[in-house]
């Protein structure tokens, strides 16, 4: 089939109230864009590919379609309703297509029969009339109408079509799916593949395409991909879906796989490459641009479908005056139209506020109001509320003289619309609210934070006043609760009052624990929600009900604060690279950083000089921090003014932090101030860090870890965006190929690499977030530090990717430097984390570069009975018990390196009962005592003074037990 590729769009939504009586449309068991059979979480941390991708998990793409000719797959498609499938127009060109092709759904692996598989015949084909085979990259879209209706279940669901308001920013990670070739002209897979690609800015895509052929004109496309290639859709993926995820979790069909130059070719150097080597981003048909055509063809079989096809079926525009009414639809029309977009602006006299009262309301219901909805904005564009369902929203008092209402409908399911009155009222009718509204509630129902299920806004100051009938009290029951946690709820919080004056507190709440229900003491309750300028979360959703008091209610103050404020902190074992509070990405955008979950990067530290945040670093051990040399090179002679702050999220708050004075600074001896080569340094602190839920070390990469191009990693820091943020930010960045990096930067050495998106807007590390760690997943949930920010580009210039020092290449220097402090690393009273990530034994070598794994490396499993001489680097596991002999066990491990070398022992595991473990320098009669190993005080690494070292284990007890696992490597003394 034709070549391929990918691209897209997104939006921010809100809901103050969703109507009751949610019912599915006929034949719909679930809602579009949901995956009931799959884990709802999506990890982009370990990047996937179709060309360069991974196998999809069964159930995570229930809308996927395979078009088959003679039983063989040739194109993909997407289920969008119980009767319709979307595919590419270039897939349906053959004569009598509907009689030659079948639609297969519920299929995941072509090699095996699956109970979810279903085949459908095609009734009719609607190809976009503007599609031309001679110019197949425009209007490349077709609708397949099925003979029979699809019955939805957990394995088969439709994808959502985009709404006119959906916007997915440049850099957003989206997903393409298909059974296409795994490489250009390569084999076809049997199981469904997926690839995650970032959206490319439209103008940039056009400029790239001009390097292919200036005659190409792209009108209805979106583009996605990495400049260095390696990941794309390919032959056989055509017609398949390209989906982006809304912030509350739904998957939206943003594009249909259409076209591309080759498969996964790089296009960063297209101008320089010969014609036969040029590549392109993935090119997808832009569904949002073709919504009107889709609506006309998807609804023509509905007898009651409104035939008027205008942007808004009623007179929208500006409404002025002290009172008025807004109706949709109007006149003889019974239903509003599909694909409507109506906008009203209400303006009342200056100094007045606006009271909205809904007379009727019936809009297609959806839990997140993403299908059809009415949305209200303040004069400054702040989102006030988003509504859908069949229950009228409660009266809204907006503290402004101007508001904007927008109504959006999708391509199916039309209802009878709404009727509302607006009225200008005096400002003192109820207290003002910076939230933009005061909800006055006289009926039972639901309330929720602004923007829910999206993040609530900063500087919110929202208010609900609830009145119950006489003789009833008010009960608030929380369904969802996620508000920025803090000691005493000093940042963001929900407060419930027993009175309108706000003097009698019924409860205050923040964090992630679901509060207990709150009862009022009378028929009045006031609820307020406030937020500061950052760290926004999902907020809350709660049910208001009126109940009869069973007994006199005493005002009690409630809260949801757990002991020691560790409600979201998981139990964790001491180690490295694991956060007690796992990181969370809401937007999966490769260009614009977002605020991190507090303390989700617990190794990140602020390096202060003169009581001011200067740069960043990462904790390697309880006494060592790694950073960039350019951060500290001019300050290494003045360590006394340095301070390391760990456990820090907000630069303006010291909650949960540990402050450690700098003892000394060690800059790499080969650091060059001009070229920034060897840009790495270590800081030794005067007192050890205490590991807890907020402070943890990061792992070093192990000996088998390599950074592949396009691998997604994470950089964290306080100034990743244009303006300095006081809250820690995070940004996902893809690793770039060396030749791409060298194209944009001069002086790139073997000790540097680049990561980030080259785009026409702000980018990674643009303010030279010096010393910030770049961490990558070494295993699910475990991170290692692969890079240290060395330099970036000012945001006012054309953005480039950030330049990072390669930590892997500095491991020998890091270890040598730390070991030079003492023969044994950090042996204070607590056990220490390994400096390398936990993994399978075969991946635990973590050897220094001058002692690479080889055919002579040993992986040995022994019992404690004899003397074992080890003369090649490797690993050993020693297991013994008192049952090995009547007098316990005794053994020696003699590690012997070549002359002129020293030995590094890396301890990975030690547990013993009634065993003595002693390390000696030398062997036999020439050995001298070096250290005794204690289970509660195990070192991470031990360095020998000479070329021979002996480990002796002995026990005389029959109930003794020993488990020891270590690796050993040999290194030149010079």
UniProtKB/Swiss-Prot annotation:
- Start and end residues of each CUB domain: 312-425, 435-547
Give the induction annotation: By human chorionic gonadotropin (HCG).
Pfam name, any one: Trypsin
Region listing for Disordered, in residue ranges = 830-858
A Gene Ontology biological process term: proteolysis
InterPro entries the record matches: CUB_dom, Peptidase_S1_PA, Peptidase_S1_PA_chymotrypsin, Peptidase_S1A, Sperma_CUB_dom_sf, Trypsin_dom, TRYPSIN_HIS, TRYPSIN_SER
Post-translational modification, as annotated? The catalytically inactive 107 kDa form is processed both N- and C-terminally to give rise to the 66 kDa catalytically active form and inactive forms of 82 kDa and 59 kDa.
Q: What top-tier enzyme class does this entry carry?
A: hydrolase
Active site: residue positions: 90, 140, 238
**Cysteine disulfide links:** 75-91, 174-244, 205-223, 234-263, 312-342, 369-388, 435-462, 489-510, 615-631, 713-776, 741-754, 766-795
EC number(s) from the headed UniProt entry: 3.4.21.120
Subcellular localization is given as: Secreted
Q: Give glycosylation sites per the record.
A: 39, 763, 926
Which CDD domains is this protein grouped with?
CUB, Tryp_SPc
Q: Which residues form the signal peptide?
A: 1-21
In which tissues has expression of this protein been reported?
A: Expressed specifically in the cells lining the bottom of epithelial folds in the oviductal pars recta.
Decide whether keyword Cytoplasm is in the record.
no
Name the major location: secreted
GO cellular component term, pick one: extracellular region
Query: Can the keyword Repeat be found in this entry's annotation?
Result: yes
Function, as annotated: Mediates gamete interaction by affecting the vitelline coat.
Record-stated family = Belongs to the peptidase S1 family.
Protein name as it appears in the record: Ovochymase-2
